[in-house]
Regions:
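Mature extracytoplasmic domains of secretory-pathway proteins
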Residues: 44-104
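Positively charged n-region of N-terminal signal peptides that target proteins for export
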Residues: 1-4
Length: 145
């Protein structure tokens, strides 16, 4: 129950700081879409882990990305799971696992989440020049502190 309340209040705080702003970009991930991913990650945690899933979206260049990790009091945050956001490719899927950690998690435990996909399977490789993983990871570095 504590984890659920923490996730709820983190979501409310996120909404008040980002998604509920007046100058919202219509191409950006919505609060609901981001929350759906956060809940999917939260469901993977053991009952008494004391951890919560945390996701943040950012625009890097011409694309939006979502980075998620697990957080808990007194421990360093987990590695980042990075997803590419696209609402045109598929009528349901919105976030596509982009980095190795996200692809492994998707293939192993999140394959049946309707909002999620795998970038490699959906768009193919190599990544286009407009996606610079170094820049993307740098933008989300704040989540690792």
């Amino acid at each position: 129950m504590k984890k659920l309340l923490c996730a709820f209040f983190a979501g409310v705080l996120t909404c008040s700081l980002t998604a509920c702003s007046e100058d919202e970009d219509p191409n950006a991930p919505t609060y609901t879409e981001t929350s759906d991913v956060e809940v999917a990650l939260y469901k993977l945690l053991p009952e008494s882990s004391g951890k919560a899933a945390s996701c943040r979206s950012r625009k890097v260049g011409e694309h939006y990305y979502l980075a998620c990790n697990y957080i808990s009091m007194g421990t360093a945050p987990s590695s980042l799971y990075v997803f590419y956001y696209d609402k045109v490719k598929d009528p349901v899927k919105r976030f596509y696992a982009l980095n190795g950690k996200a692809m492994s998690l998707y293939d192993g435990q999140l394959k049946y989440e309707p909002i999620l996909g795998n970038y490699k399977d959906s768009f193919g490789l190599p990544l286009p020049e407009s996606i610079n993983m170094g820049e993307v990871m740098k933008v989300f570095e704040f989540m690792r502190k």
